[in-house]
């Protein structure tokens, strides 16, 4: 963490956010890592640190793979659907419900990359819920990479952005 803060300081950044994938993502950090983030100083090398996680949405009920007690200690929580972790039904209605339910969790700040065409979603419904719950929707740069693994992202991003503009919902990039 200190090395990243130093690199950020060297680039003149005032703040950075560090959001490692939560434990159910293969190769990610153990629960203990996330529990111990609360003791990490939030200012290092003159750079403000926002420490959190990218939690995995596990099912259509919006459950995530970290307990609320741990999420409550974080500065920033992103919740995303990832193929290795999501075990719920995969219809458009079920995926939409997964996002809507996750946004009801007061500890979740951002819905990560909802533009992945492998998980079709009702964008109007999630944009309206994002406005209601003050949850940001992420436009992920990996989604825009030519030849990326996510499908239909350009069209999905344009639809999401059009609706975010219409309903005045801010996004996260």
Model-derived segments and their meaning:
Residues 14-15, 19, 109:
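Short acidic/polar active-site loop segments enriched in Thr and Asp
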Residues 14-15, 48, 136, 170:
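Residue-level detector of anion-binding/catalytic polar loops
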Residues 5, 9, 103-104, 165:
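Non-catalytic positions within long, well-ordered alpha-helices that form the structural scaffold/packing
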Residues 21, 169-173:
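Short acidic/histidine-rich active-site segments
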Residues 155-165:
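A short, acidic, amphipathic alpha-helical segment used as a generic capping/interface helix at domain edges
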Residues 2-16, 36-44:
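Alpha-helical scaffold segments that flank or form the walls of functional sites
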